[in-house]
Amino acid sequence: MSALDSAGAAAAAGQAATAVDRVADAVRAEILTGTLSADAPLREEAAAARYGVSRHTVRAAFQRLVAERLAVAMPYRGVRVASFDRETIIALQQLRAALEVEAVRIAGDRFGPEWPELVLGPARDALDRLAASADWLEAERVHAEFHHALVAASGSTRIIEAHAALGAELLLFLLHVRPHYTLESLVAEHRVLLDEVQSRGPDALRDHLEHSTRLLVGG
């Protein structure tokens, strides 16, 4: 293959990747805003026509959403928006507790009851941006960043990486819990949490997660 052919192939691959990103981003946003409800079908042909791309591109975009657990591929039913049912909620919150509570415990061992500003800064910044969020989709992203910042305080690379892998599932959680909050109450609750993870340690984070779980599943 000539250098010109190689350059052309690379450009084509880049364009295909960009198209996949564009479709995945658009459908992801519709899922995370609730425009596409749980169990809604994601149809390749309709999406290809809507976004002006090939069905192959749409298929790759849908596969990305499946990998993010925002969609599920089901035999004979195709790809559908993931259901956020009781079992899914409890499993997600148990995993979050395993990671976030342990991260706060480690941070407490590192810093004691007063974490340094260098560590608190990213969480405080996230709270300020959460308060200034223009819409709930932005709030979902910043809420996730706040919890990532708490986990990062542990300094544990493996825990930080595992928590980051929750990705879009954490955004989806706030979509479902947000009917129980105003933006103001969400910010206020997390400001208190930032103080209490220092003074009370992992118990504060555990209580926070259990409270939000009860909002969705009761008990």
Roles of regions detected by a PLM:
Residues 30, 129-133, 151-153, 196-197:
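Hydrophobic side-chain positions on well-ordered alpha-helices
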Residues 24, 89-92, 100, 116, ...:
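A general structural signal for well-ordered alpha-helical segments in protein cores
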Residues 124, 175-219:
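C-terminal all-alpha effector/ligand-binding and dimerization domain
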